[in-house]
Amino acid sequence: NEPTEWKLVFPKKFPFDKDVKNLTDKIEKYLKDSNAVLLKSSDDIYSVSDNFIVIHGFSSKESANSVLSVLKEHKNYKIKDQAYIISTEDYKIVQMKKKFEEWLLLNK
């Protein structure tokens, strides 16, 4: 069964520092600049000490990857944060079962 939707996930330690504000500002700027109406971002709680900054709404892994490239390389964003592309289906399991570490090992 092929995934139908993908997300970009930026794992972050909680409570947040100014780097996270910087990341979320750049994501919001990108969403506004690109007029990406199908994409939205959120701050999702994962555990007491970890949260995910997430961009939702990609129709393919490739489109998520292409946005990640823009965020990393374009002069207006230049993000350095570690990010992962995950299917919505996998993300639900990761969140319900708190299995992000296991998911990382399976998706290197």
Language model: regions and residue ranges:
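Acidic/polar low-complexity segments and flexible, solvent-exposed patches
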Residues: 1-108
